[in-house]
């Protein structure tokens, strides 16, 4: 099967590319060749925003499936849809749970009315526009709305930050009195869902994807410490009226949870990676790939303000 994956150089798109190569598919990655490419892929060297170049690059190539990871606007989607020669049997857009307004009833279901989310701003509204544009061209396309993705190849300084704190045997600083729960999904489980969609074409075309349940931030931090050295973190509360949360903690002060009932009906339960196992996989990757994570100055802020 010929599969086109937009991106292919970092985290979600790179993991997807390597996942489907390992499954024996012919994987084409569309990117500007600014990074070393994964083994086994066919590079389509192009800036997707340059429509003429995109047309020329895709000319003469037919795809059975498209996994669009790097579409952030309606224009991104439209250019790709117009440049594809022959309609693929399956087009999957990786959207985001940022399409749901923060004040909507939770857990967010696929039928929740999408709209502005003040936490995510333009990112969320642009994703809504991308979804709508795709459905204009491909009414039977699939749209996936994940929460926080984590796991191997995660270049964002989220679990990696907590791993680093655990390695240094540091206490952990949490927003004071926070009861926030976070919703996660392991990158390999995302690939399992994509594979299922390509192979089985389920009836549900817009899917929330995520773990069966969210997790309290303190429990999430404790699991990160556990997979590093089996230690239990010492927690300190931080008054967020005095210190901006994002100065010392890798998530916004925002709790949300997705209803993933529809996803659970099609996901092979035996393949579902639990949080501790997923964090262990992430840490094993991180130990040998620290330079691939975009670190933030959280530890510097902590050292200067909380010691």
Where are these regions (language model features)?
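N-terminal Rossmann NAD(P)H-binding glycine-rich loop of SDR-like oxidoreductase domains
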Residues: 3-23
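Conserved C-terminal active-site "lid" loop/helix of NAD(P)H-dependent oxidoreductases
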Residues: 242-270, 280, 289-291
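NAD(P)H-binding glycine-rich loop region in Rossmannoid oxidoreductase-like domains
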Residues: 34-37, 42-87, 99-100
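Conserved beta-loop-beta element that borders a ligand/cofactor-binding pocket
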Residues: 131-153
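Mid/C-terminal beta-alpha module of Rossmann-like enzyme folds, strongest
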Residues: 197-254, 260, 299, 306
């Amino acid at each position: 099967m010929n599969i086109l994956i937009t991106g292919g150089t970092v985290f979600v798109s790179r993991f997807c590319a390597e996942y489907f190569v390992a499954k024996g598919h012919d994987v084409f990655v569309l990117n500007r060749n600014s990074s070393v490419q994964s083994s086994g892929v066919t590079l389509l060297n192009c800036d997707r925003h340059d429509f003429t170049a995109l047309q020329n690059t895709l000319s003469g190539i037919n795809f059975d499936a498209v996994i669009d990871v790097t579409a952030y606007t309606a224009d991104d989607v439209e250019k790709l849809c117009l440049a594809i020669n022959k309609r693929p049997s399956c087009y999957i857009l990786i959207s985001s749970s940022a399409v749901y307004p923060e004040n909507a009833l939770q857990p967010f279901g696929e039928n929740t009315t999408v709209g502005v989310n003040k936490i995510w701003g333009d990112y969320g509204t642009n994703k809504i526009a991308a979804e709508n544009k795709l459905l204009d061209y491909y009414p039977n396309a699939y749209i996936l709305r994940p929460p926080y993705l984590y796991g191997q190849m995660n270049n964002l300084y989220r679990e990696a930050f907590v791993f680093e704190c655990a390695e240094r045997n540091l206490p952990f600083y949490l927003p004071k009195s926070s009861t926030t729960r976070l919703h996660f999904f392991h990158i390999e489980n995302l690939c399992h869902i994509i594979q299922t969609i390509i192979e089985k074409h389920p009836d549900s075309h817009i899917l929330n994807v995520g773990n069966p349940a969210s997790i309290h931030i303190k429990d999430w931090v404790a699991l990160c410490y556990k997979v590093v050295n089996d230690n239990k973190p010492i927690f300190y509360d931080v008054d967020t009226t005095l210190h901006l949360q994002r100065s010392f903690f890798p998530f916004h002060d925002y709790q949300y949870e997705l209803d993933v009932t529809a996803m659970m009906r099609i996901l092979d339960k035996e393949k579902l990676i639990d949080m501790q196992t997923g964090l262990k996989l992430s840490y094993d990757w991180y130990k040998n790939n620290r330079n691939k994570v975009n670190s933030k100055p959280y530890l510097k802020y902590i050292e200067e303000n909380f010691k």
